[in-house]
C-alpha cells in the first residue's frame, strides 16, 4: 500500500487512534471506570463457552514436561543458551511473571499471563524475556488451548529447576489467560526506574511492591544504585513482605534463584535498543536489539551487572552460600558500568557461559551481600549454609508459594502434580462433612434470624462485611470460612466491632439451636447463617418498600478455624476505605474516596451498574460503617427503596462542602438542611456515567428493577468466593 494512502487512512480513522486528545487528556482528574470493564467476554477470542479448566484436564502434562526438558538444552542461534542450558533464563521468566504479585491488593502475579502485554513485556527488569517467550512459542503452539501462557510460564520455571537437579514442591495448573493488559497502578512515575513512590524515611507508597518503576522488587546494585548491602536489605525486606514473603522465604528465594544462571552486562547499555512496545512494526514485538558485538551470547546485555554466582550454574548446589561466606568482597564495576562485587583473593573457578577455556572469580550483587550483612538474613543464610537440606526444602516451598500465591483456594489447583499438603497461606477451609439445610430449613432459619430482633442494618452490614473482603485478583477473602468472627477481621474498625459481636452472638445462638435439633445430621455453618441473615433482612426491607423478592441462597459454606488462618496475612485485606459502607479510615490514602470505591468494586468483580445499585441499596438500608446518616437519602431507612437516587438527583437540593469529605444538602428555596453526604455519595450525581446509571434507578417505574438488580448484585458478592457453585 502506498505510504500516502496509509497516512490518509490513518488520519481519517473514526476512532481517532493517535489523533487528538482523549477525554482523560482534557479532564485528567475525572473518575475513570474503565477498570470495571476489564476482561469482558468480547475481548476473549476463545469465546464464552470455552472452559480452560476442562481443557487443561485433557492435557498430556507428561508430554509437555518432556518437551520442556528437551527445550532446555536446544540452544538456538538467534539467542544462544548460557552454558548450553536455558534453565536460568526460564527461572527468571517464571519468577518475573509471578513476582509482580502484591499482597496489599492481591493484584499482579502469574495468573492471566500478563507478561505478554505492556507494560510488563517492556519493563527494564524484564529485558530479553521476550526471547524466553519466543523460545516457548513452539510448545504453546503445539498444545494450543489446553495450555495457557500463564500456566506455561510457571511450568517452565519448575521444569528448569528439575532439569538442573532440584526437586520442586509441586505444580498446579488452572491459570486462564487474559487477553488485554491489566489496568493497574504501578506507580506515579512517568520515566523508567524513577522512584517518586517514597515519602518520609523511605516509606514505600501502598499498594506498590517494587522500589522503582519497571522493577520487580529491588535494584540489584542497591537503593538507587548505592552499593550498600544493609540499605539493600531494608528494601528487600519491605518489597518481599509486600509479596507475602517472610525473611526465611526471602533468603531462600534469592539464594535459590541465584544458584543458577548469570546476569548479563557484557558492554555499554546505551547500545541496547528499544523495548518491544517501542519497536518498529517489522521487529514483530522483538525488543532490546543490541549493537554490542553480536548482541547475544557472550555479548548479551540484559541489565547491567555481569555476574555468575556459582561454580555449577546449571546444577543445584550450595555454592551460593559457600561463596557468600568464604570470601570477603570488594566493589567493582561490570563492563556495562554497573556496581557489583568481586571475591578477594579467590581462584578463578567460575565457568564462562560460552568459552570453555575461560574462567572467572566469584561475583555477587549488592542485594546478594545483604543476605550476609543484615543480621537477621545472616542468621538464616548461615543456617541454610550449614544445613543444605533445610535450604532445599525452604526454597522448594517458597518457589511454590511465589508461583501459586495468586491462584486462590486449593480447589482451583489442577493436575497430577498438585501437592497434598495443606498450606496456611492457601487460606484453607474445611470440606463440607454433613448434610446441608434444605429449602424448608432455610425458610425456618430466616424466620428465626428475624425473630432475634436484629435490625436490617445490622444483618446486612454483617453479611456485607463478611463477603466483601473477596478479591478477584488473588481469590482471597469472602464469606466462606466465616473468618469475620476471627482475628483480625472481628476487630477492624470498618466492621464496627461492638455491633458485629452482637450480631455474631445472636447468629451463633440460632446455629446452636438448629444443629442440636435438625434431623438427619443436618448442620448450618455460621458462614452460611451470616449470608442468610443478610438475605432475610433484604427480603423484609424490600417488602417494607412494597416489593416482594426472594434472595437466592445456596448453603455449603464452612467455618475455618483460627489454626487455619494466618492472621497477619489477613491484615492486608482490611479496607482502608470502603465506599459501599461510607467508610474512610485514618492515615494516608493514595486514592480519593470515589477512586477507592471503584477500586474496591473492581476487586469484587462488579460492573458500573452493579456498583451503583449496591451503593444506593446499602445507603437506604443503613449500612454505613459508623451508623452515620451520610448518604441516607430517605425518610424511611430500612426499606429497600430507590430513594437514594430519587433524592440525590432532585433539583430541590443544593450542596456545599463542610469538610474535605463532607457535604451538606439544603433545600434550594428555604435553605433548610435536608441531607449530609460524602464524596462517594455525590459522585453518583456528579460523574456523567455514574449519573446515567443513577437516573435509571431514579425513574418512577424503577422500584422493582432497582430491587431485582440490587438482589442480583448482592448475590454476586455473597457468592464471589463459591468455587463449588461455579463448578
From Swiss-Prot:
GO terms for molecular function: catalase activity; heme binding; metal ion binding. InterPro entries: Catalase_peroxidase, Haem_peroxidase, Haem_peroxidase_sf, Peroxidases_AS, Peroxidases_heam-ligand_BS. It comes from the Bacteria. GO terms for cellular component: cytosol. Its EC number is 1.11.1.21. Formation of the three residue Trp-Tyr-Met cross-link is important for the catalase, but not the peroxidase activity of the enzyme. Its cofactor is heme b. Binds 1 heme b (iron(II)-protoporphyrin IX) group per dimer. Pfam families: peroxidase (PF00141). Heme b binds at residue 258. The record marks 92 as: Transition state stabilizer. Bifunctional enzyme with both catalase and broad-spectrum peroxidase activity. Important for stationary phase survival. Belongs to the peroxidase family. Peroxidase/catalase subfamily. HAMAP family: Catal_peroxid (MF_01961). NCBIfam families: cat_per_HPI, PRK15061.1. This is Catalase-peroxidase. It comes from Caulobacter vibrioides (strain ATCC 19089 / CIP 103742 / CB 15) (Caulobacter crescentus).
Amino acid at each position: 500500500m502506498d505510504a500516502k494512502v496509509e497516512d490518509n487512512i490513518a488520519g481519517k480513522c473514526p476512532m481517532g487512534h493517535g489523533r487528538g486528545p482523549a477525554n482523560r487528556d482534557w479532564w485528567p482528574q475525572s473518575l475513570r471506570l474503565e477498570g470495571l470493564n476489564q476482561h469482558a467476554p468480547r475481548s476473549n477470542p476463545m469465546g464464552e463457552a470455552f472452559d480452560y479448566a476442562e481443557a487443561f484436564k485433557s492435557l498430556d502434562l507428561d508430554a509437555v514436561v518432556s518437551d520442556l526438558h528437551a527445550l532446555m538444552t536446544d540452544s538456538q542461534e538467534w539467542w544462544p543458551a548460557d552454558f548450553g542450558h536455558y534453565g536460568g533464563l526460564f527461572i527468571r521468566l517464571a519468577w518475573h511473571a509471578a513476582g509482580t504479585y502484591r499482597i496489599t491488593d492481591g493484584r499482579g502475579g502469574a495468573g492471566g499471563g500478563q507478561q505478554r502485554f505492556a507494560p510488563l513485556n517492556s519493563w527494564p527488569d524484564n529485558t530479553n524475556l521476550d526471547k524466553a517467550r519466543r523460545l516457548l512459542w513452539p510448545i504453546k503452539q503445539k498444545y494450543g488451548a489446553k495450555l495457557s501462557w500463564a500456566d506455561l510460564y510457571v511450568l517452565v520455571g519448575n521444569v528448569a529447576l528439575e532439569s538442573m537437579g532440584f526437586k520442586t514442591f509441586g505444580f498446579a495448573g488452572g491459570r486462564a489467560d487474559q487477553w488485554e493488559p491489566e489496568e493497574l497502578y504501578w506507580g506515579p512515575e512517568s520515566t523508567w526506574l524513577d522512584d517518586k513512590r517514597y515519602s518520609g524515611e523511605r516509606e514505600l507508597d501502598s499498594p506498590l511492591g517494587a522500589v522503582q518503576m519497571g522493577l520487580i522488587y529491588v535494584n540489584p546494585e542497591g537503593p538507587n544504585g548505592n552499593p550498600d548491602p544493609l540499605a539493600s536489605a531494608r528494601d528487600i525486606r519491605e518489597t518481599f513482605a509486600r509479596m507475602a514473603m517472610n525473611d526465611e522465604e526471602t533468603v531462600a528465594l534469592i539464594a535459590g534463584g541465584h544458584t543458577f544462571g548469570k546476569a548479563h552486562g557484557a558492554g555499554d547499555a546505551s547500545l541496547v535498543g528499544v523495548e518491544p512496545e517501542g519497536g518498529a512494526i517489522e521487529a514483530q514485538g522483538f525488543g532490546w536489539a543490541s549493537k554490542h558485538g553480536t548482541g547475544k551470547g557472550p555479548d548479551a546485555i540484559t541489565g547491567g551487572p555481569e555476574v555468575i554466582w556459582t561454580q555449577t550454574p546449571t546444577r543445584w548446589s550450595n555454592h551460593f552460600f559457600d561463596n557468600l561466606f568464604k570470601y570477603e568482597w570488594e566493589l567493582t564495576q561490570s563492563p556495562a558500568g554497573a556496581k557489583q562485587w568481586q571475591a578477594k583473593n579467590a581462584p578463578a573457578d567460575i565457568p564462562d557461559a560460552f568459552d570453555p577455556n575461560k574462567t572467572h572469580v566469584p561475583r555477587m550483587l549488592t542485594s546478594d551481600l545483604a543476605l550476609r550483612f543484615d543480621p537477621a538474613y545472616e542468621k538464616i543464610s548461615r543456617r541454610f549454609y550449614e544445613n543444605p537440606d533445610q535450604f532445599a526444602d525452604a526454597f522448594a516451598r517458597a518457589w511454590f508459594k511465589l508461583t501459586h500465591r495468586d491462584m486462590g483456594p486449593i480447589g482451583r489447583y489442577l493436575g497430577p502434580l498438585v501437592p497434598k499438603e495443606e498450606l496456611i497461606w492457601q487460606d484453607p477451609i474445611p470440606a463440607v462433612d454433613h448434610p446441608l439445610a434444605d429449602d424448608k430449613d432455610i425458610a425456618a432459619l430466616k424466620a428465626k434470624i428475624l425473630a432475634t430482633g436484629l435490625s436490617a442494618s445490622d444483618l446486612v452490614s454483617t453479611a456485607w462485611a463478611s463477603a466483601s473482603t473477596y478479591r478477584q485478583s488473588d481469590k482471597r477473602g469472602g464469606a466462606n470460612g466465616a473468618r469475620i468472627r476471627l482475628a483480625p477481621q472481628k476487630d477492624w474498625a470498618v466492621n464496627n466491632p461492638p455491633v458485629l459481636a452482637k450480631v455474631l452472638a445472636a447468629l451463633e445462638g440460632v446455629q446452636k439451636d438448629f444443629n442440636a435439633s435438625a434431623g438427619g445430621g443436618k448442620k448450618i455453618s455460621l458462614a452460611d447463617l451470616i449470608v442468610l441473615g443478610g438475605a432475610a433482612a433484604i427480603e423484609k426491607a424490600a417488602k417494607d418498600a412494597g416489593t416482594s423478592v426472594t434472595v437466592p441462597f445456596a448453603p455449603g459454606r464452612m467455618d475455618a478455624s483460627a489454626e487455619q488462618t494466618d492472621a497477619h496475612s489477613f491484615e492486608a485485606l482490611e479496607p482502608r476505605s470502603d465506599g459501599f459502607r461510607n467508610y474512610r479510615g485514618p492515615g494516608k490514602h493514595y486514592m480519593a474516596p470515589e477512586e477507592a470505591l471503584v477500586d474496591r468494586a473492581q476487586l469484587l468483580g462488579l460492573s458500573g451498574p452493579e456498583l451503583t445499585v449496591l451503593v444506593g441499596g446499602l445507603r437506604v438500608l443503613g449500612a454505613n460503617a459508623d451508623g452515620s446518616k451520610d448518604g441516607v437519602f430517605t425518610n424511611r431507612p430500612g426499606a429497600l427503596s430507590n430513594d437514594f437516587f430519587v433524592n440525590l438527583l432532585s433539583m430541590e437540593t443544593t450542596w456545599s462542602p463542610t469538610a474535605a469529605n463532607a457535604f451538606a444538602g439544603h433545600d434550594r428555596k428555604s435553605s433548610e438542611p435536608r441531607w449530609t453526604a460524602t464524596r462517594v455519595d455525590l459522585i453518583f450525581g456528579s460523574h456523567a456515567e455514574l449519573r446515567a446509571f443513577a437516573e435509571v434507578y431514579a425513574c418512577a417505574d424503577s422500584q422493582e428493577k432497582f430491587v431485582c438488580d440490587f438482589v442480583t448484585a448482592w448475590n454476586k458478592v455473597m457468592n464471589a468466593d463459591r468455587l463449588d457453585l461455579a463448578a
